[in-house]
Amino acid sequence: TPGRTLFPYTTLFRSSGPGSFTGLRIGMGTAKAMAYALQIPLYGVMTMDGLARNIPYTTDTICTVIDAQKKHVYAALYAYDGERLQVKEEPFVVEAASLVERLRNQHKRVVFVGDGIKRIAPLVEDDELLIIGDPIYRIPKASSLLLSARPLIERGESADPMDMVPHYIRRSEAEVLWEEKHKDNPAMLKENPTVTVI
């Protein structure tokens, strides 16, 4: 239509992980290509930050959990200080049972959000301090991710699309298997294996 812009957006933001390795690569690659082609700013937001902001306010500790397969979850801890959401512990990968035991020993109320609660829920049945969040909080919402990106946008701290990479937290199974296969051949191993998305 004459006079109308085909792509009327001026800013892009996307979750940068952790999560599915393939999903992160596809999503990140798409966002980077769009930002580069349209010459607009691109902001990356940790998936955990968006999940935590699904809960508008609570005095409880928020534990975001994303399924990491093989009985593990990606987890991060948050708490509100007034209206400000603060990261209490940066994302890490841990066995679900170990995470529950650790939080139970703190004797404080914790609410879990994210798709990883399917691994947590059976471990916290009838626990009055470890609470499974409402199902509506299990998936990151665009509005919650935008709230997390807002300070970056206000400060103009966008990323160079060519330099932005996903937050994997741990190496992929393919990298682990490659290292195991070539452990006797140092020339085949990289000191810091990475995946570049362009």
Give the ranges of each region predicted by the language model:
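Buried hydrophobic packing segments
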Residues: 30-34, 51-52, 145, 149
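DPxDG-like acidic metal-binding loop motif
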Residues: 13-42
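Acyltransferase
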Residues: 133-198
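Single conserved hydrophobic/aromatic residue that forms the stacking wall/gate
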Residues: 1-11
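Catalytic-loop motifs flanking and including active-site residues across diverse enzymes
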Residues: 26, 30, 95, 141-145
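Surface "functional belts" at beta-alpha junctions
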Residues: 41-140, 194-197
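Active-site catalytic microenvironments for nucleophilic, acid-base chemistry
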Residues: 37, 54, 80, 148-155
